[in-house]
Structures are given as structure tokens and as C-alpha cells.
């Protein structure tokens, strides 16, 4: 069965100009940190300071799934190129075809933590990456095959970690805000919404991920992190064992499905339905989840404790999701009704 989400159905295939619909079931792409040897973006440079804190600059937007958004960026004053915003990527990454096209200076190989294992990949130097009115200098970017990225590159947490990142799921829009200046990407991000907002405090993970502890699955407390590039949410096997132990029947039936990562590895995951999932005060009710021991959990030190990767399927349950990196806060706003259709995954 062709993999297709509600977001794709609403937009139509033609709207996905250039983003690979074969997609990555998980966006633990380009590094849940490009491991050792990848330095974070150096000093931030405002290319064109907006005249007021309320001024916004539009960015050409491409969308895939609910939160996989692509912005037009310039690399060393050339472009525009489409880079996908990915909160699961520790480092900003670039496609091999673009790195070769721009003849970017090579850097030493770096260790990249993929979905099932760590791998060594080449990296290049980007002197200046411009995103609308903001420019970031001295980026060390891992390089991946373009077919695996499905875009010209990924904007990772080394850049995103300076912003408040907001996803307007209903309007299929996103915005980045820094020092009161908002950069709008697609749709019409509106202020003054009456949607109730309740922020959850977060801690910072090894590679900049926002780690949440106010999350429970069937009453079991878990450590969770958000990966906006991941199509589906995935729990680790420690979580699976914990919730199975809490059930008198020992657990529900599940079936195996393959999942794939940007570094090319694949592994088998179990699909099952949990009775209750809570994000702070938000009760999501019965929810389908995948379970697998991703390398990402081990990388973040979460292999032996119940943990959950929150992907686009859960983010899409809300009207708005905001990751305020400077203030270590995540806000889920406007919980929507649970869709009645089953999760569409390869093999159905």
C-alpha cells in the first residue's frame, strides 16, 4: 500500500515539490547529533535586521506530513535551496549533490548516529547559511545522499536551538522567532489566538533535543523527545515491557513493520495500540504506537528506561505545537479529535 498521510491527502501530491514522499519513517536523521567532530553553528549574524519586532519575512514553504517543512535557504550567497526543518537532527546537514555542486570545502569525516547504528560520513564547511533575514556562519555539515534526505538539506538543532519554533498544524505553517522577530514560513501564522496554551518544562538532551518528563503511556512515566522529521512516534522496548507488566493480560497483539532511517539502515518495529497517552494535561486516549530499540535511544542514554520519540502523528493531534528552545518549554495547544482511520504504514 502506498504510504500516504492525512497531510498529503489534504495538500495533494503536486504540493510536495521536491520532497521525497517515500519519506523517512523516522527523521533521526543526520545525526541525533552528528556526533563527535561536529561543532555547533558559531556566531549568529543578522543579515537584515527587521525594522520592528512585529515585522515578519515570508519564506517559501514546502510541506510534507504535518510538520516536515522546508524553507528556502542560501548557501554562501547561492540558492535558494530547500532545507527541511528537523528537530531530530542534531546538526544541519546537506545533500551530496548540493555539496558537490557548490564545491564546499571538505572537513574531516564525522561520526553520525543513525537509526540503528553509528556511521562515519564526510562533512563540509558552510561559511554562511542564510534563512530569510538571519544568517548563520561557520557550520560544519555532515553530507548524506540526496535520495535519503528527500531535500537539499536539513536544518538541525545547531541552528534551531536559538529560536522559538512554532508549528501551526491546521494552516500547515511554521514560524521561527528570535529576539521578538518572527520569520513566517507558509500559511498565515496569527497572533492573539484564544487556544489555551500550557507549556511543559523541558531539559536539554545530549545533542540539543528537548527532553520531556511530563508524559505517560498507560500510566507509565516516560522520557520523551520531539522529532518533527519523524513520521510516526516510537517507544523503546523498555517502555513496551513496562506497560505490558502493568496489564493483567500481559499486553496486546502486535505486528512487525519495517522502519528506515536516513543513514540507510532499517530494522523491525512492533505496531500496537496503547489505551492511554498523556502529554502534560492533554489526554490523547487510545493511540497506535511503534516500539523498537532505536540506536537513538542508546545515544541519548535512554535504552534502560521507558522512553518515547514523539513524531508527526502525535504532533498532528494538536492545532499548534511550539518548541521554545531558549526558555526550555514545549507547548501543545488545541487538542483535536482522534482520527477514526487506522495508522497507514508500509505493508498495510
Q: Where do the protein language model's features map onto the residues?
A:
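Pepsin/retropepsin-fold aspartyl endopeptidases
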Residues: 2-348
